[in-house]
UniProtKB/Swiss-Prot annotation:
GO MF, one example: NADH dehydrogenase (ubiquinone) activity
Recorded family membership: Belongs to the complex I subunit 4L family.
Cited function: Core subunit of the mitochondrial membrane respiratory chain NADH dehydrogenase (Complex I) which catalyzes electron transfer from NADH through the respiratory chain, using ubiquinone as an electron acceptor. Part of the enzyme membrane arm which is embedded in the lipid bilayer and involved in proton translocation.
EC assignment: 7.1.1.2
Protein name from the UniProt record: NADH-ubiquinone oxidoreductase chain 4L
Bilayer disposition of the protein: Multi-pass membrane protein
Organism: Phalanger vestitus (Stein's cuscus)
Gene Ontology BP terms: ATP synthesis coupled electron transport
Subcellular location per the Swiss-Prot or TrEMBL entry: Mitochondrion membrane
Keywords: Electron transport, Membrane, Mitochondrion, NAD, Respiratory chain, Translocase, Transmembrane, Transmembrane helix, Transport, Ubiquinone
PANTHER family in the record: NADH-UBIQUINONE OXIDOREDUCTASE CHAIN 4L (PTHR11434:SF0), NADH-UBIQUINONE OXIDOREDUCTASE SUBUNIT ND4L (PTHR11434)
Amino acid sequence: MTSINLNLTVAFSLALAGVLIYRSHLMSTLLCLEGMMLSLFIMMALLISHFHMFSTSMMPIILLVFSACEAGVGLALLVKISNNYGNDYVQNLNLLQC
């Protein structure tokens, strides 16, 4: 495994660990999810260029589009939760609460 692949795998693993550890605040969870998506984007682009699979060259762009949509929905949810509750705790996302 080359050092670039190892660094990207470590970055993805650290972002995943951040999602699992810092899941009390929505903003920190969203930042860790963005780190995961960016490391996946770079890994996918490098693998496509390394193996010369140019028929799948649009896959990283599609992943980036879905990542931007996820960020937009997450920030809209963050604004709505902070307007309603005054904080960004993930426990406020429970829809079964009255």
